[in-house]
Amino acid sequence: IIGPNGGGKTTLVKTILGLLKPIKGKIQFYREGQSTPSLRIGYLPQYTTFDRKFPISVRDVILSGLHGKHFVWHRFGTSDQQKADDIIHLLELDNCAHNAIGEISGGQRQRALIGRALVCDPEILILDEPNTYIDKKNQDKLYELLKQVNTHCAILLVSHDIGTVLRNVRNIVCVNHNVHYHPVSEVDEKLIEDSFGCPFQLVAHGQIPHRILENHTD
C-alpha cells in the first residue's frame, strides 16, 4: 500500500483491523475462497511508544502477541514458549532475547515487534512502515524473511519506499482518497503520479527502480 501522507493509508488499515467502521461498503474476509467473518491478523503499527525503563524482555514482548488468544494473565505453556523461541531464531534475536526491550538497538526492537505480530500465526500480516529503524542491509534481510512468511500468510505492507516495494511485492494498492490496485508489472509513472498528485520519474539501475520527483508547485 503506497500513497501520499493524508491520502487514507492509515484509515484503510484501521478499517481492515476493525478499529474504524466504514462509512459505506464493508470489509469482507475470505479463507480458501469461502467468506468468513474474521481472520487472525498480526499488526505492526508505524509508531509504537513504550516506557524504555519498563522491565520486559524481548522474549516476553514477542510472547505478548499471544494475549489475543489467551486471558491477559494466562501463563504461557510449552507450545507457546517454543513458538516464541522459533520466532526469536527466525528473526536472529537469539543474542538479545533476554535483554530488556529498552536496552537493545532500534533495529532489534523493530524486529522484536515484528515477532510479536508473527507469533500468533496470522493469516494476514499488516506492517505499517516496517523499515523504520532498520538499516539497508537488514532491510534486505527483512524482505527475504517476509517472502518466507508469505508462503503461508498474506501480507499487507504500507511503505513510502517505492523502489524497495516494487522489487519485493506482487501487487500495489495506491491510496490517495481513491484506490488504484494493480500488479507490479502494470505500475508506471502515470499511475504513481495519479496516486501522489505530483509528477515524477521512475529510474532503474539494473533491476532496482527509484523515484525522482520532478519540479512541481506543491
Regions picked out by a protein language model, each given a short descriptive name:
Residues 125-129:
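Catalytic Walker B motif of ABC-type/P-loop ATPase nucleotide-binding domains
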Residues 186-218:
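ABC ATPase nucleotide-binding domains
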Residues 63, 78-96:
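Conserved ABC ATPase "signature" region
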Residues 17:
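Helix-to-loop junction immediately C-terminal to a conserved catalytic motif
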Residues 25-41:
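Conserved ABC transporter NBD signature motif
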Residues 100-104, 108:
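Conserved ABC ATPase signature
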Residues 170-185:
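H-loop (His-switch) and adjacent beta-strand-loop-beta switch element
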